[in-house]
């Protein structure tokens, strides 16, 4: 059983004005001037004499790159021309991938995002056991006005959000004032429906809870936009969900730029995994995995890896190389780790995986304890790997000799070796696995699950995530 009283198998099986927006990637910064705009498809007069415009958003999808979603009313009217305020509430059992992706993408877009706890303390344990630290308690948000309020799902997180009276009032006011609001996964059915906020709204949600949605208005799409409301299906559609909201707030140019940084591309439809010198990774015991992290690590990567592996019944330890259990990840997400690296080093691990993030990678490289752990992992023939810029950590420690790898495509990265595999999102060479990171990290994590347990386990986990697993 997991720490929330749910077994991992249960979790896995849950089947517009000119403005400046500063886009930040983990590998550097890009500043650009953006003119947010939506293409108007038609104008329909309402009974109140106002106009309603149908708008079309075109976003590439991990499950259907040609997907088109339609806005059926005016949306995205913010509180100011330069700053968009966003609220992301979290509670005990919130789906951490969904929460962290929302925060990450919207902050990259330039939004002022507040993470608020509906519990009595700031520290909140997610549905897969990752502990997040909110910025404020929800009571601090009661009198604030937000351009967007977006609810992550997860169980029992969606129930905890539903039972918060302050949040209910905030959401109802948001809908009444016709400002943007959204929900993903279980949240549409479990949270918004009891509040009466799905009335006459086309809605989607997690397949396991789809039957709870109003039949006539429920649709099986990854993203559904109906007026001010945007809904989505699960962790595997989190990036689409967040990008859709970013586009509604900041415009298509901003959303497309972030999409490129995050590596959301056609590889989702045509997987680009490469394996060389294949060996058996299966074990006769529960796999033990160490994920070392630091200030500046990519929150999306570390949270996604831990979440996916825990769904697959892997024993995961997230360890800080800092002096504190608390780290501040890239884009400001605050995470409470399981152990300090010194304590973690007292045990041995079947896999050690380094998440990326430029600053985080530099701090991981400086850890003498981690360097020793990695050398022991290499010398014993056990598995290790990295995502994003952290492949350079392995390279500088001499752990990628004669190994084929991949790394985040950045001009600032020095060539690691002559065996870089161009175009590959995940590369496995014997007992070493590397990935481009960011939006490809779910594929990376599922590749690990497949190597440890086989395709059937990986496919089962993928279904719970609402992420398309490639046919074998």
Curated annotation (Swiss-Prot):
Q: Kindly give the SUPFAM superfamilies that the UniProt entry links to this protein.
A: Class I glutamine amidotransferase-like
Concerning InterPro entries, the annotation shows: Class_I_gatase-like, DJ-1, DJ-1/PfpI, Prot/Nucl_acid_deglycase
Q: What happens when the gene is disrupted?
A: Albino phenotype and seedling lethal when homozygous. The phenotype is due to the absence of thylakoid membranes and granal stacks in plastids.
Q: Where is the PfpI endopeptidase domain?
A: 84-250, 287-453
Tissue expression pattern: Expressed in young leaves.
Q: Does the keyword Transit peptide apply?
A: yes
Its localization reads:
Plastid, Chloroplast
The main place the protein resides is: plastid
Q: List where this protein forms a coiled coil.
A: none
Q: Which Gene3D superfamilies match?
A: 3.40.50.880
Give the transit peptide range. Answer: 1-60
Tell whether Chloroplast is among the UniProt keywords: yes
Give UniProt keywords alphabetically: Chloroplast, Plastid, Repeat, Transit peptide
A GO biological-process term: chloroplast organization
Q: Which GO terms describe its cellular component?
A: chloroplast
Q: What else is known?
A: DJ1C lacks the catalytic cysteine residues in the endopeptidase domains which is a highly conserved feature of the family. However these residues are not essential for the function of DJ1C in chloroplast development.
Give the protein family. Answer: Belongs to the peptidase C56 family.
What function is annotated for this protein?
Plays an essential role in chloroplast development and is required for chloroplast integrity and viability.
Descriptive protein name: Protein DJ-1 homolog C
Q: Which organism is it from?
A: Arabidopsis thaliana (Mouse-ear cress)
Its gene? DJ1C
């Amino acid at each position: 059983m997991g720490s929330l009283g749910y077994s991992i198998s249960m979790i896995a099986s849950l089947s517009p004005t000119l403005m400046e927006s500063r886009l930040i990637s983990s590998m550097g910064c890009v500043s650009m001037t953006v003119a947010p705009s939506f293409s108007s498809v038609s104008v329909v007069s309402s009974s109140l004499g106002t106009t309603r415009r149908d708008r079309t958003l075109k976003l590439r999808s991990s499950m259907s790159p040609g997907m088109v979603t339609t806005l059926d009313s005016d949306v995205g009217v913010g509180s100011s021309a330069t700053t968009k305020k966003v609220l992301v509430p979290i509670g005990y059992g919130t789906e951490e991938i969904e929460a962290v992706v929302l925060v990450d993408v919207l902050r990259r877009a330039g939004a002022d995002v507040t993470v608020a706890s509906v519990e009595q303390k700031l520290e909140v344990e997610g549905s897969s056991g990752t502990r997040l630290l909110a910025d404020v308690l929800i009571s601090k948000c009661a009198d604030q006005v937000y351009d967007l309020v977006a609810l992550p799902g997860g169980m029992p997180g969606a129930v905890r959000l539903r039972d918060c009276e302050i949040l209910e009032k905030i959401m109802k006011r948001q809908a009444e004032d016709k400002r943007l609001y959204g929900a993903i996964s279980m949240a549409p059915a479990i949270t918004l429906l009891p509040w009466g906020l799905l009335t006459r709204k086309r809605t989607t949600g997690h397949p396991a809870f789809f039957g709870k949605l109003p039949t006539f208005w429920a649709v099986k799409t990854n993203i559904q936009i109906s007026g001010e409301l945007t809904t989505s299906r699960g962790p595997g559609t989190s990036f689409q969900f967040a990008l859709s909201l970013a586009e509604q707030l900041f415009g298509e140019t901003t959303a497309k730029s972030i999409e490129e940084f995050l590596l959301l591309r056609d590889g989702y439809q045509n997987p680009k995994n490469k394996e060389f010198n294949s060996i058996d990774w299966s074990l006769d015991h529960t796999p033990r995995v160490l994920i070392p992290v630091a200030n500046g690590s990519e929150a999306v990567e570390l949270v996604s890896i831990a979440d996916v592996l825990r769904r697959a019944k892997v024993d995961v330890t997230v360890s800080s190389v800092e002096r504190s259990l608390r780290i501040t990840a890239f884009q400001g997400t605050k995470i409470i780790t399981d152990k300090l690296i010194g304590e973690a080093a007292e045990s041995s691990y079947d896999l050690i995986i380094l998440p990326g993030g430029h600053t985080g990678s530099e701090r991981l490289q400086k850890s003498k304890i981690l360097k020793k752990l990695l050398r022991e992992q290499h010398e014993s023939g056990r598995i290790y790997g990295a995502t994003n810029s952290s492949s350079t950590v392995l390279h500088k420690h001499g752990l990628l000799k004669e190994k084929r790898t991949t790394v985040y495509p950045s001009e600032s990265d020095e060539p690691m070796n002559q065996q870089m595999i161009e175009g590959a999102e995940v590369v496995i060479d014997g007992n070493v696995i590397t990935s481009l990171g960011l939006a490809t990290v779910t594929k990376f994590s599922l590749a690990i699950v497949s190597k440890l347990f086989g395709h059937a386990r990986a496919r089962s986990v993928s279904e719970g995530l609402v992420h398309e697993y490639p046919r074998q």
